Amino acid sequence: MYTIFFYNVILYMIFFSQFIKCNNRKIEFYNSYINLKTKGTDNIRFFVLPRIDYPTTIIINNKINFTNDISDSYDFDISDNNINNITLIWNKSLTSTETMFWNCEKIIEIDLSNFDTSSVTTMKSMFFGCSSLYSLDLSNFNTSSVTTMESMFSGCSSLYSLDLSNFDTSSVTNMGLMFFGCSSLYIL
């Protein structure tokens, strides 16, 4: 059993061989469950990936159990990590992806083709500072409820092309600095 301290909430992550596969530089969360528990009456409001200090490929599936009621909303944060490739399969109802990949400077590719964004209202700074990000598939993003995309891709200086043809921006009120620092972006 490993203990991670975060924002005065102790999360107990119980890992058995069927729950997590960790070999060299690849971490894969299978369809089994990761149980996250809180101490006392505090609610878990974040699923936070512990800091990883070496280049890693990570695959995260959506089977995560929370012991307290977090039905109102919760965030998912893997920011500021040394991960270079992510496949994220998540169909829980997220309302915010703000700073989700904040400062993941080593990340080259993110596969979000199976990522449910239908309830997301803010994507502010979602990929901010992902300076090595070269490939990003957002073709299945449902952005009909999103109101802010401010700084969403700011600092993505290696991003060459981005297909936003399926983005519904009818509810968006703030796109300020959305592509600031995207000096390699030639195809939009």
Range-by-range predicted roles:
Residues 1-9:
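Classical eukaryotic N-terminal signal peptides for Sec-dependent ER targeting/secretion
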Residues 84-93, 106-119, 131-147, 158-173, ...:
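Structural signature of tandem-repeat unit edges
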Residues 38, 60, 88, 115, ...:
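Broad hydrophobic/π-residue packing in well-ordered secondary structure
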Residues 98-100, 119-128, 145-154, 173-180:
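Consensus positions within tandem repeat domains that build extended binding/scaffold surfaces
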